[in-house]
């Protein structure tokens, strides 16, 4: 009897050792689509209209709702509490050059946002953060197309986008990866000659955006919003007061709203504060690693612009811990959306651990030992095993070019 029991237990143990190899389930990722006709998407807070001929990620609305919630958290106010609050209407226009990043301009006005296909990917593009910040602002007062107010309007949008990106890095690193590093925002609003800023009163730069900066109006505006938040506890009180300031031109109304909200000395205190706190806006090492150690899976999307056409996980090194990377959407994007010949496409990897490559059914195709190149034929996704650092994960052999 004891012998039979021992044989049974041995067989059971062997079975348990074998089962996991066959029970491995394929990892599922959001599946994108290329629109063949105009479509509309709806979620709790968004109504999105997308032209035909646009690649749309499968988790687009989920991502935007996540940004919406994060933005309310960092700003301390709710979209829905604004006197002008409505569902956010987003229009995505198809354009042959629309994936050219900085060479086009997304816009927002009241509850309306115009974007382009590259912004839908949210892969290193924080445009949706900036434009959504505009809607949050405009929900609390009557919007204006008067560019004299660029410091206030663009400053609030850029600072709120920065704060949101920072929050995501700490609380939702997968979504943070999608919108790009917060330090990129600081890089874009660097001040080239800060001393010249102090030669004029702030109200002057509200009328004439400061020219010696990465982005006039945005640069000094972001810093002013940081000042309001850190010194007075918020950078939003002026928005509701703006509608009450009905006399004078736009900048005069903004000055009145600021003084009514924060006190008569609010403008005078900015320069002394900025001189003591300018280090807050140092963007730091632009090659610092991307930290994805708390992320289970991400999708690689190609980047197309006038400087480079690439399909890589990141332009920086990446820290990971058992990270799954979807490559199927990149192949769909290249082949069916951009019309590229991917028959000779290869996966090039350079990291500190092994990398397993799987087909769409979860079958292990091959394992790369730290560094190597394999054909993409049949590969749907990979797993970066263990804890390590990735120095490169690229799809090559389809006509890519690098800056």
Residue ranges and their predicted role:
Residues 25-28, 38-44, 52-91, 96, ...:
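Zn2+-dependent metallopeptidase catalytic core
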Residues 49-60, 116-123, 141-148, 209-214:
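Second-shell loop/turn segments in exported
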Residues 24-26, 246-365, 375-403:
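Beta/coil-rich, acidic/histidine-enriched accessory regions frequently appended to metallopeptidases
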Residues 4-22:
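Sec-dependent N-terminal signal peptides of Gram-positive bacterial secreted proteins and lipoproteins
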Residues 17-27, 33-34, 335:
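Intrinsically disordered, low-complexity Ser/Thr/Pro-rich tracts
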Residues 186-267:
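Active-site-proximal alpha-helical
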Residues 105-190:
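Zinc-dependent metallopeptidase catalytic helix centered on the HExxH motif
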């Amino acid at each position: 009897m004891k012998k039979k029991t021992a044989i049974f237990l041995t067989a059971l143990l062997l079975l348990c050792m074998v089962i996991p190899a066959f029970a491995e389930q394929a990892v599922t990722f959001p599946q994108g689509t290329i629109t063949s006709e105009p479509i509309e998407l709806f979620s709790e807070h968004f109504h999105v209209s997308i032209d035909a001929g646009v690649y749309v990620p499968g988790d687009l609305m989920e991502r935007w709702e996540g940004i919406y919630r994060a933005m309310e958290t960092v700003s301390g106010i709710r979209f829905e509490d604004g006197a002008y609050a409505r569902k956010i209407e987003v229009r995505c226009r198809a354009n042959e050059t629309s994936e050219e990043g900085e060479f086009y301009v997304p816009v927002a006005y009241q509850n309306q946002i115009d974007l382009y296909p590259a912004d839908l990917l949210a892969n290193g593009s924080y445009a949706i953060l900036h434009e959504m910040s505009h809607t949050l602002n405009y929900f609390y007062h009557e919007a204006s197309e008067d560019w004299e107010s660029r410091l206030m309007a663009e400053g609030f949008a850029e600072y709120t986008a920065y704060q949101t990106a920072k929050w995501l890095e700490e609380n939702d690193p997968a979504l943070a990866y999608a919108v790009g590093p917060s330090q990129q925002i600081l890089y874009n609003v660097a001040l080239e000659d800060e001393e010249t800023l102090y030669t004029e009163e702030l109200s002057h730069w509200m009328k004439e955006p400061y020219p010696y900066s990465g982005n006039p109006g945005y640069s000094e505006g972001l810093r002013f919003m940081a000042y309001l938040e850190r010194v007075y506890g918020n950078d939003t009180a002026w928005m509701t007061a703006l509608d009450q300031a009905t006399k004078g031109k736009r900048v005069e109304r903004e000055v009145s709203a600021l003084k009514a909200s924060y006190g008569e000395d609010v403008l005078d205190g900015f320069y002394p504060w900025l001189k003591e706190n300018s280090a807050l806006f140092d963007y730091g090492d632009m090659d610092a690693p991307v930290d994805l150690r708390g992320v289970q899976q991400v999708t690689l999307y190609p980047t197309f612009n006038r400087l480079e056409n690439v399909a890589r996980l990141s332009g920086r090194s990446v820290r990971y811990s058992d990270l799954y990377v979807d490559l199927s959407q990149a192949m769909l994007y290249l082949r069916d959306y951009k019309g590229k010949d991917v028959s000779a496409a290869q996966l090039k990897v350079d990291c500190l651990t092994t990398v397993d490559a799987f087909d769409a059914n979860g079958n292990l195709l091959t394992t790369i030992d730290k560094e190597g190149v394999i054909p993409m034929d049949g590969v749907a996704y990979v797993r970066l095993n263990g804890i390590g650092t990735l120095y490169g994960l690229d799809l090559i052999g389809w006509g890519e070019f690098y800056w």
